[in-house]
Amino acid sequence: MAAVETRVCETDGCSSEAKLQCPTCIKLGIQGSYFCSQECFKGSWATHKLLHKKAKDEKAKREVSSWTVEGDINTDPWAGYRYTGKLRPHYPLMPTRPVPSYIQRPDYADHPLGMSESEQALKGTSQIKLLSSEDIEGMRLVCRLAREVLDIAAGMIKPGVTTEEIDHAVHLACIARNCYPSPLNYYNFPKSCCTSVNEVICHGIPDRRPLQEGDIVNVDITLYRNGYHGDLNETFFVGEVDDGARKLVQTTYECLMQAIDAVKPGVRYRELGNIIQKHAQANGFSVVRSYCGHGIHKLFHTAPNVPHYAKNKAVGVMKSGHVFTIEPMICEGGWQDETWPDGWTAVTRDGKRSAQFEHTLLVTDTGCEILTRRLDSARPHFMSQF
């Protein structure tokens, strides 16, 4: 760390003189960030590093090359970045949509860095919350509403529709149900849902690219209502797709459902990855390792951690009253991923397609309840597109 003029340490609760500044902040041009010692710096790292991410994201947005299509849409906003596949972002993004003040908001909604302090307080713990009957009813409600919103998005999937238009509809549908769209400002995510097209594994940011015939697109919805989050996603076909896309999406859904069939008290969370990877590999596909299922209730992401790959080291045994997601991401090629310069969009390193399905589950005495199931059909939407 570089020596600087004397300042007051920025660690919460410390008023010592600070003579050291974070070297990364100096490099990124972030003002302030003074600490009295390496110990204070390390103790503040979990929160402090978010400043780096935000600064990098803002820098990436400024590094705009020449316009490459007609009008005001830029399909190459990050000069020099080598894309892994054919998909390109369509910038600039539309402005972040407001949420009315009467809608109850999670703790990160108005945080300048989008940080959830309630999640940070429990970071690193492996203790899994047992939900009360009141908690369970809260989860049933928000998951049912999240399903309604995903079904609205499903009805919009066709060539020519932009993911920005889907996000707009999702945002309005959340507000109409007195819900906050959980992704919005979660660690500064700029939209109300995630839309992941073709080689995008997850966390795709809705933009003005029209969906094209032959695409596959995942829409990931999470709602917040009365203090609880409900989370689900599905992958859809855009018009007519090739046989490879059909097999990938079908297999991904089967991976999810086979894992769900194993959920009951006494099962180790690590076992789910063995089930998922066995089925994926039997069909010639790979399983993403960087992103996992998670506990969910009053916190968006919490224990347990639920990896989808085999021989993982996940901690915990299922008990009645646990609520968590399973959301396998299955790839045509290799499982390795990288992230676009926007800091969010995860893509396959080889540029091949990836699909995903997700449900929020409640462990019961004899098995599990799929809280985000369709109420009008036992089939996912893509099966109606065959």
Curated annotation (Swiss-Prot):
Predominant localisation class: cytoplasm
Gene encoding this polypeptide? METAP1
Which residues does Zn(2+) 4 bind?
231, 294, 327, 358
| Protein's name according to its UniProt entry | Methionine aminopeptidase 1
> Which keywords has UniProt assigned to this entry?
Acetylation, Aminopeptidase, Cytoplasm, Hydrolase, Metal-binding, Protease, Zinc, Zinc-finger
Residues at which Zn(2+) 2 binds: 22, 25, 48, 52
Q: Which cofactor does it need?
A: Zn(2+); Co(2+); Mn(2+); Fe(2+)
Task: Write out the residues that bind Zn(2+) 3.
Answer: 220, 231, 358
- Zinc fingers typed C6H2-type, residue spans: 6-59
Protein's organism: Pongo abelii
Does the record's keyword annotation contain Zinc?
Answer: yes
Q: Name one Pfam family in it.
A: Peptidase_M24
Q: What class of enzyme is it?
A: hydrolase
